[in-house]
Each structure stands twice: as C-alpha cells, then as structure tokens.
Amino acid sequence: MFTGLIQDIGAVEAVERSADGARIRIATSLASEIAPGDSIAVNGACLTASRADAAGFEAEAMNQTLALTALGGLEAGDRVNLEPALRASDRLGGHIVQGHVDGVGEVVAVEEDGFARRLRVALGPELLRYAIERGSIALDGVSLTIADLGDSWAEVSLIPETLERTNLGAAAIGRRLNVECDVVAKYVERLTGERA
C-alpha cells in the first residue's frame, strides 16, 4: 500500500524489452532503502525490485502491466515518481493508493492559476465513473484532489510543492498518465451493485 506522497524522482537508466515484458533500471537517491523483493510504486504502478545496489534498482514489468499502464512508453532518460511501500509506522498523509493502475489518461490542457498549475486530464468513462469533485485520484502515483470534473475529463490543481517534488511539474499536453481511482469508490460500487 502507498500514500501517493512521492519520495523521489528517479531517472530511468535502461529499459530492456523482451517477449515476456521489460526490465527497467532506475537510479534513485532512495537506493539505500531498497532491497530485492521490496514493493515500490513507479509512476503509481506497484513493481517489485529484483535487484538493488548503491545507485538504484531494477524491476520487471509483465506485458500486461506494460499494456494497461503508461510504463510501456518508458525510455532511458525519463524521470519517474517513486514511492516505497508504506510501513506500519508511517503517516498516511495522502490517500490509500494500492499501486494497481486502473487505466491511462492524457493531459489535454495545462493552465497557470496563480501560484498553482491546473492539469486537465482526459479520462474514459470506465475511470470517470469513480471520480467526484473534491474526491481523491492518483495521477502517476501522486495523491491529488479533483478540482473540477467534465463529461470526459478531470482537472487537478498542482501546488508548488507538488510541481517541485514530482514529475508532474514537467507534464505537457499529450502526456499519458497512470490513473488510479479512489479504492473506496470502487468498493462502494461493488457493494451497492450486488444489493441491487
């Protein structure tokens, strides 16, 4: 489980693709805290570190993960949001993020708004059904609040801290983002749907 509070922006050093998926090598200042077998959210997708050293870690992504997330487009040089799994002693400062990406959205508008920046992200109906204004959403692993909602999009407002500490500060029109909807909304739908 994760919180959506990014701990580091890592640098993709290599992506080795094969018939089975991809091995991704990421350099990070968190390297000393990562051991083989640890779960780490990479742009919001939960991956397992298979190797770790003083400079970073490697993780494998299956073809299904590459197809259902924006990780399939990663290349060497890309910057990725990183968050190690939540420990029992950690504070839950964001919202409950599982690292199970529900789909991919695309940035369709970027607008400066005083000291903040608003991102409008196009979402399919399978994602919008779980979105409510002032509700939680994770974009590339970042815990955010939905500021506005349309028929085909959700908009979030990024404060300077988020712009500085995550890769969303570089988000431009056309960028694909991993989207994880609020797990509480999914459980409510499931429970009420079974009763109907």
Name each model-derived stretch:
Residues 1-196:
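Conserved loop->alpha-helix
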